[in-house]
Amino acid sequence: MATALYLASLRDLPDPAVDDSLLPLVSPARQEKIARLRLPAARRRALGAGLLLRRVLSDAGEELPPIAFGPQGKPYFPDRPDLQFSLSHSADAVLCALSDSSVGCDVEILGPARPELAERFFHPSERRWLSALPPSEYDEAFFRLWTLKESYLKATGLGLSGGLESFCVDLGGGVPRLWETPDAERWWLFSVLDGSCVCGLCHSGETSPILRRVDLLP
């Protein structure tokens, strides 16, 4: 199957603690997670992620299987090794990727970059490349790098324990590429800016997905 990448807004979702009409559409485990969350924004994010995962699976002709978590917190379907997924959210945006091979995704809202984070977490080659950019290009480039690096660590299952600075993403040639990691040739990177949402994807497929923006409400 081709890798699917879906983006949705959480803006119109109700707080499930006030309006629980959408809760039956997500898994019992996610309902329990939502019930444990104290902040309305966190409950809406958890609900939105569950709804988007259900939508992506439905469009692929699949039902929601049970979900388990790996040692570093990566979610997976233990009964469906042929289906891999990844979820991410930022502010009022939620992103979901579904594939038949290893996949990771990340979304961030485009805004002022934080150079101190680049100094702390980016590879030296990435920092040099960023510092040479015109100021007008810096913010978008920063978030493209950040989302692609997060996506790679999610796809590998390493999470942040893998170290954002331990490998390099090269954006200089137009097509994102991985460097300084032994499995670089296995992975394909995809980056897209949709409105204010910077979306990154790392997967072991060989085709770039088309980002679909969808509504979460029935």
Range-by-range predicted roles:
Residues 1-218:
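Core catalytic alpha/beta fold that binds nucleotide/phospho-ligands
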